[in-house]
Amino acid sequence: MTISIRGARVIDPASDLDQVGDLHIEAGKIVAIGAAPAGFSAQKTLDGAGLVAAPGLVDLSVALREPGYGRKGNVESETRAAAAGGTTSLCCPPYTRPVLDTPAVAELILDRAREAGNAKVYPIGALTRGFGGEQLSELVALRDTGCVAFTNGLHGFASNRILRRALEYAATFDLTVIFTSQDTDLAEGGLAHEGPTASFLGLAGIPETAETVALARNLLLVEQSGVRAHFSQLTSARGIELVAQAQARGLPVTCDVALYQLILTDEALVGFSSLYHVQPPLRTRADREALREAVKNGVVQAIASHHQPHEADAKNAPFAATEPGISGAELLLPLAMTLVQDGLLDLPTLLARLSHGPAQALRLPAGRLAVGQAADLVLFDPQGSTLAGESWYSKGQNSPFVGHCLPGRVRYTLVDGHLTHEG
């Protein structure tokens, strides 16, 4: 299908393009920005007046819950939710049953994603078999199947020697390793950031050092091995400082933060709502401000939803017995727009952290709005609003933002020139 988008504000952070004009799509690719090519005839025209046309969002962590956790979500439901949030490309972590540590599991997810057709899905493989921290997964075979990176998540390693060997092996094949840096011993049994709020509520604390001790070790091993590394879900000011120092030394490291960490603090836990139970935990206002500044200055390249949908029973229990995680993919763009509304970021910078930045971090063919590129884009109304929860595609409704009126509204999401969401 040929499509013309007329009179939109076209923003491509990768090329610093920011202009009002037209955009033309043919055979799934962008064929012109501005005047239509000779002989071009649009079969469908979208009125872009007052709207922003931007690269489709690239979300680095959307738990699809398939295979194994159908009560929480599946590939179709969660990719549809992501499309509603403006996402066209997403990475799914290996938190499945069985764990995504074999090509067969990766192939299953990719087949289901192609059938759904809502977004481009890039699997992340488990670094060790079953997250056991002892034996490496079939990393090269997983890469050849389509895995773009590897992680052990919040699971530890049997020894630092095994971790070192894993990183050296990954470096040999130019594989990217994703770290969620949290020391398992220091964090064991913890439910909230160690501080006044946790003490007041009587919740076991997770100290900042659970992040920084693991992060310091991981950075040293990255430097020794030369592996490409991405640090996911940073939560603390000190953690940001360590990554910034590593980047200044020229280490091949990137990082992301969860969007909700830029909005919330541990003070949200007062009231014991399990909707705020996340791992790694929400931290202090000072930490939140440091994360925001790092997003602004580019130390943090990517903002991700870290979407973890749950069934109702997983959250309907005493706080300590609930499962951590927030269902966030569906609200990625409107919730992120609060950062623009509050004057923390300008719109091009926000879009860079939601598209080009994450794509670069994991070397994905996404995050660009340019002639010859795939027509993966989002068209949204920056002056509109979204009532969170008025429509909901994810199986998990575990979001503390449901019922909130958020700035911005996704009007169209397109993947390879095909409409995957219209709102």
Curated annotation (Swiss-Prot):
Give GO terms for biological process. Answer: purine nucleobase catabolic process; pyrimidine nucleotide biosynthetic process
Q: Name one GO molecular function term.
A: dihydroorotase activity
Q: Does the keyword Manganese apply?
A: no
What Gene3D superfamilies is this protein classified in? Metal-dependent hydrolases (3.20.20.140), Urease, subunit C, domain 1 (2.30.40.10)
Ordered alphabetically, the record's keywords are: Pyrimidine biosynthesis
> What cystine pairs are annotated?
none
Q: Which InterPro entries match?
A: Amidohydro-rel, DHOase, DHOase/Allantoinase_Hydrolase, Metal-dep_hydrolase_composite, Metal_Hydrolase
Q: Which Pfam families match?
A: Amidohydro_1 (PF01979)
Taxonomy, superkingdom: Bacteria
Q: Which GO cellular component terms, listed alphabetically, does the Swiss-Prot or TrEMBL entry include?
A: cytoplasm
- Report the function annotation for this chain: Non-functional DHOase.
Please give the NCBIfam families that the UniProt record associates with this protein. Answer: PRK07627.1 (NF005791), PRK09357.1-3 (NF006838), pyrC_multi (TIGR00857)
Q: How does it assemble?
A: Heterododecamer of 6 active PyrB subunits and 6 non-catalytic PyrC' subunits.
Tell me its family. Belongs to the metallo-dependent hydrolases superfamily. DHOase family. PyrC' subfamily.
Q: What is this protein called?
A: Dihydroorotase-like protein
